[in-house]
Amino acid sequence: MSSLIKEIEEAWQIKDKLLQDSSKLITLKQTLNDIIESLNQGTIRVCEKQENSWHVNEWVKKAILLYFITTESQLYNNNYNSWYDKVAPKFSADTDKNTFKEAAIRKVPGAVVRTGTYIAKNVVIMPSFINIGAYIDEGTMIDTWATIGSCAQIGKNCHISGGTGIGGVLEPLQAKPVIIEDNCFIGARSEIAEGVIVEEGAVISMGVFIGSSTKIVYRDTGEIIYGRIPAYSVVVPGVLPAKEAGKPGLYCVVIVKQVDKTTRAKVSINDLLR
């Protein structure tokens, strides 16, 4: 692995000149293709949890960006569409039944998944878009018209509801993508962006928008935090009142309650949001 990282780091230093060196380019392209395949298999990840905190593998981001630099756009076709892109689809018209059965996933018409994306077993992909570098863990549902951004990390047994946007990020290199940990529910038409972490078991109501500067308010105490939804929180949209009468309030999101793991498992999402 260290030699692989070294090769990517060296190529990154001369990225603006790569296309001028055909011999080096051939070798690098093979390395990049191998990395993209490792992302497909989930053996390499853009972001990993280490000792209870998330760590960005910047070299993997660099590899993806180098892949864009060194790859020419091609024409792709399936049975009902054609497109012109640098990134191949993970699944194409040539993907056979056995491939899907072995992967143990379900993918319906209209679902677009770019190569370099990991899709674990028992994932259901409705018509949606999943970008390169994303990681979707076991038992998760990506619902209709959801968008999973580049490098976004989605945990096990999550439900990403219809029309939801999960932000991704390739640059800046050190920036974390959005991370949705295990057993989370993200309500319809919500948007989670700018590296926000939604911790395990959290429930996000419909129509909630959270970025790095969004105020996240504990309803009980008034405490305000940023960039992180604590584990097993139930979150709804809200407004912070203005300090001066007659002035407009400002949007925030509100943690209305926090439940334990047992309650989260037993109680329906609708009951938690009431």
Curated annotation (Swiss-Prot):
GO cellular component: cytoplasm
SUPFAM superfamilies assigned: Trimeric LpxA-like enzymes (SSF51161)
Residues engaged in binding substrate: R106, D143
Keywords attached to this entry: Acyltransferase, Amino-acid biosynthesis, Cytoplasm, Diaminopimelate biosynthesis, Lysine biosynthesis, Repeat, Transferase
Localization in the cell: Cytoplasm
Protein name per the record: 2,3,4,5-tetrahydropyridine-2,6-dicarboxylate N-succinyltransferase
Gene3D superfamilies referenced in this protein's UniProt entry, alphabetically: Hexapeptide repeat proteins (2.160.10.10), Tetrahydrodipicolinate-N-succinyltransferase, N-terminal domain (1.10.166.10)
EC number(s) per entry: 2.3.1.117
Catalytic activity: (S)-2,3,4,5-tetrahydrodipicolinate + succinyl-CoA + H2O = (S)-2-succinylamino-6-oxoheptanedioate + CoA
Biological processes per GO annotation: diaminopimelate biosynthetic process; lysine biosynthetic process via diaminopimelate
Record pathway: Amino-acid biosynthesis; L-lysine biosynthesis via DAP pathway; LL-2,6-diaminopimelate from (S)-tetrahydrodipicolinate (succinylase route): step 1/3
UniProt source species: Rickettsia conorii (strain ATCC VR-613 / Malish 7)
Keyword Lipid biosynthesis listed: no
GO molecular function, one term: 2,3,4,5-tetrahydropyridine-2,6-dicarboxylate N-succinyltransferase activity
Lineage: Bacteria, Pseudomonadati, Pseudomonadota, Alphaproteobacteria, Rickettsiales
UniProt cross-references to InterPro entries, sorted A to Z: DapD_Trfase_Hexpep_rpt_fam, Hexapep, THP_succinylTrfase_dom1, THP_succinylTrfase_N_sf, Trans_hexapeptide_repeat, Trimer_LpxA-like_sf
Pfam families from the UniProt entry: Hexapep, Hexapep_2, THDPS_N_2
Gene: dapD
Assembly with partners or alone: Homotrimer.
Superkingdom of the organism of origin: Bacteria
HAMAP family for the chain: DapD
Keyword Plastid: no
PANTHER family reported for this sequence: 2,3,4,5-TETRAHYDROPYRIDINE-2,6-DICARBOXYLATE N-ACETYLTRANSFERASE, ACETYLTRANSFERASE
Family classification: Belongs to the transferase hexapeptide repeat family.
